[in-house]
C-alpha cells in the first residue's frame, strides 16, 4: 500500500466513523415536551464536515441513528459511537446517553424521531438494544455487518429490530469506493429511514 492510498483510506474511515461521534454540549435541539417511547428510532445530522460527507455519500437526510430504551424508568438512547469516551481509557463501543445529549447542539442541528407501527415489536427491539449495550460490544470500525461482535450505528438499530423478527433496512445497502479500497454492504441511516414500518413522530 503506497503512502497516498494510505492517507486516502485513513481520511475516508475517519469521516465515516466521526459521523457517528459527537462532543458534549449543554444545549439541545430536542423539543420540550416530546415524549419518547421504547424502540423509537432517532436520527440526527450535524453541521460538521463529517456529517455532510456521510449525507452526501448516503444520499439521505441524516448521518447518525440510535434507538430509545428504558433504563430504570428513564428514557435513554443507545447508539454505537467512536471517539467519545465516558472515562479515561474507555474504548469505542455501544453506549447509552440521555436524549438531550444525543441531540446536543454540538452533535446535531436537525433531528427526527420515528416510531415503529407495532408497539410490541418496538419494545422487543428496545430490550435487545439495552442487552447489546450491557454486553459492551465494540464499535465496528470496519463497517462489516457480517461481524456480529462489533456494531456501527445503523447496524445496531437493524440488529435490535431483527431480534423482534423485523428488518428495517431490508435489502437496502450501500457500497463505498475510494481509490484502492472498496466497502460493501454497509447499512446507512437512510436504509433505516426508508422503512415503511417507521412513522415520523417529530422532526426538528
Describe each region flagged by the PLM.
Residues 38-42:
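Loop/turn positions that initiate beta-strands
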Residues 1-8:
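Bacterial N-terminal signal peptides that target proteins for export
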Residues 46, 69, 81, 117, ...:
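Sec/Tat-exported extracytoplasmic proteins
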Residues 44-112, 138-151:
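Glycine-rich catalytic cores of cysteine/serine-nucleophile enzymes that process amide/ester linkages
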Residues 21-34:
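Bacterial Sec signal peptide processing site at the extreme N-terminus
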Residues 17-19:
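C-terminal motif of bacterial Sec signal peptides marking the signal peptidase cleavage site
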Residues 61, 124, 128, 152-159:
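Extracytoplasmic/secreted proteins, especially bacterial periplasmic and envelope-associated proteins
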Residues 22, 141-204:
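Activation targets extended, charge/polar-rich intrinsically disordered C-terminal tails
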Amino acid at each position: 500500500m503506497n503512502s497516498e492510498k494510505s492517507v486516502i483510506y485513513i481520511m475516508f474511515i475517519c469521516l465515516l466513523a466521526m459521523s457517528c461521534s459527537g462532543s458534549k454540549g449543554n444545549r439541545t435541539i430536542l423539543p420540550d415536551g416530546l415524549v419518547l417511547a421504547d424502540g423509537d428510532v432517532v436520527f440526527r445530522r450535524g453541521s460538521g464536515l463529517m456529517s455532510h460527507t456521510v449525507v452526501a455519500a448516503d444520499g439521505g437526510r441524516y448521518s447518525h441513528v440510535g434507538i430509545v430504551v428504558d433504563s430504570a424508568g428513564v428514557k435513554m438512547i443507545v447508539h454505537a459511537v467512536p471517539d467519545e469516551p465516558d472515562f479515561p481509557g474507555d474504548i469505542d463501543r455501544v453506549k447509552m446517553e440521555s436524549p438531550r445529549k444525543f441531540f446536543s447542539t454540538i452533535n446535531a442541528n436537525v433531528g427526527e424521531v420515528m416510531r415503529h407501527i407495532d408497539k410490541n415489536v418496538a419494545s422487543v427491539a428496545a430490550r435487545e438494544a439495552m442487552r447489546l449495550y450491557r454486553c459492551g460490544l465494540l464499535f465496528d470500525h470496519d463497517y462489516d455487518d457480517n461481524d456480529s461482535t462489533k456494531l456501527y450505528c445503523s447496524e445496531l438499530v437493524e440488529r435490535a429490530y431483527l431480534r423482534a423478527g423485523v428488518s428495517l433496512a431490508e435489502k437496502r445497502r450501500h457500497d463505498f469506493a475510494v481509490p484502492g479500497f472498496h466497502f460493501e454492504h454497509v447499512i446507512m441511516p437512510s436504509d433505516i429511514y426508508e422503512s415503511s414500518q417507521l412513522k415520523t413522530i417529530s422532526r426538528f
